Amino acid sequence: MCGIVGYLGKKHDAYPILIKGLKRLEYRGYDSAGVALINEDGDLSVYKTKGKVADLEEFCTDKDITGHIGIAHTRWATHGEPSSVNAHPHYSQSKNLAIIHNGIIENYAEIKHNLMEKGIEFQSETDTEVLVQLIDYIQTKKNLSLLMAVQVALHQVIGAYAIALLDKRHPDTIIAARKQSPLVVGIGDGEFFLGSDASPIIEYTDKVVYLDDGNIAVMKLGEELKVVNILNEELSPEVQTVDMNLGQIEKGGYPHFMLKEIFEQPACLTNCMRGRINVEHDRVTLSALIDHRSKLLNAKRIIIVACGTSWHAGLIGKQMIETFCRIPVEVEYASEFRYRNPVVGESDVVIAISQSGETADTLAAVELAKSRGAFIYGICNAIGSSIPRATDTGTYIHVGPEIGVASTKAFTGQVTVLTMFALALADAKGTVSHDEYTKTVKELAQIPAMIKDLLKVNDQIADMARTFTYARNFLYLGRGFSYPVALEGALKLKEISYIHAEGYPAAEMKHGPIALIDSDMPVVAIATHNGMYEKVRSNIQEIKARQGRVIAIVTKGDTTISQIADAVIELPDTMDCLEPLVATIPLQLLAYHIAICKGKDVDQPRNLAKSVTVE
């Protein structure tokens, strides 16, 4: 949700690094921003404002922004409205400490009440200020070091957090801690960097430590990184090399990250398949299925847990796995699964899908399933994130950093991995014929080229979008493998254009949504040449009979539906099971161009965050 950045060193001024880091984290979504710095005189200054990082920069133009140590933050409101007062960093009452925090302190009201009874005054409505006031109170009352005060305070806290803390009495130290919220320490030559993920760090160093739950990091100038737990037991941090370059997170000439990421999909899916699909022998090989063959082959049931777009990918995966592997598959919202005491056990495989690998509900669902003895398989994009570290095995989608808040290439990457998983497992189980297996593998390998050709419809869709910006509601229809694509298309439109949209199975239209159809409600119908073609064509005729306006997604060469639809987008002809990978592309572009026509911020839509690390 929020973005955390920190810097400590003598090579650079902290402020430019912090601001640049916040801009790299803008994709996560936020409503306010702030920075805390300790200057050479030992003064601790906090500057913060509602709005964008650019607003913070403007606010700081006449401020003292000197110093070689600092922390910075972008906030997405959870406790307290978006405002300068509620923005981070927060001072303690003594103004000796400043803190930034990502997460939710569940028992903050109780702690706040106790502190107020002791005379502590609060300036904001946030749970974060409660934490810094608690640390300051413990440090003063018990005469403890900052580290020990943090450890004692965190013992009292219930909830999730990633924090970074400055103490003006120790202008050479940053203390950071995490629990259920990501935090990465970058290690440079005599300097330290801190980030919610690696994107603010990689310009300066590729050596990082991903903090685990319960870790507290002490970054002190002139010393090695020290990592301890809440009991002050010293740990040995694993230093990893980040395989990401700066060019991967720049716009590359595109006006928006979202459009760039839509157009990256041919290359991304090629990368996703690299080393996994042997085109010469028409084989799919996933190391996870080799290493854990027995556990996966003997699964009685597969449960997919995910949120948002990843849940839609899971719906496609369900159909794929059931079709090829003949194993029952359930797809659950992780946020529901974790709280409803599900029936899950040792004979189950749970597949957890998350772009960021940090989705709080999905991570909690993983922990619940693990506690019941299930085998956990992760499908993530962010290497080294929490979910891959919590699972038994898994597969990275390898589509590179996704900066736009609305997921595009991560979705197609997830569907590609689920397709490869289904094919590899079916081949191992013997539940798919040789001909069907090889045909599907061959066709899957051609998908990147199909998408590359399909992206030529961008200008056509941009023109089409202008026709439909008037709409206040959209209906998306699909059947079979296309139904989850309809759901995903509707979600994309909602996310970035703020137009209400619903995805429905086309056959269910007559059970309610048909009552809404009139000349003011566009309907996007996925009507490709699959087994449901005639039925969807009938649905389109029902819509037209009620003056509905139809945008039809059809197979190239279709001459029937083009005669009755108001607008037509053609797809390359491919197998039914692979159709989601191509059908989703024009829906991504349609959502993008409608949002642009309406003047919306497509990369950072309101109220949304890229990585949902709180419940």
Predicted features, each with a name:
Residues 258, 549, 562-564, 574-615:
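Generic C-terminus detector
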Residues 297-439, 443-446, 526-567, 590, ...:
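Glycine-rich phosphate-binding loops that contact phosphosugars or nucleotide phosphates
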Residues 72-85, 280-293, 317-353, 359, ...:
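Glycine-rich oxoanion-binding loops at beta->alpha junctions
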Residues 1-251, 255, 267-301, 339, ...:
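Conserved short alpha-helical segments that host acidic/polar catalytic motifs at enzyme active sites
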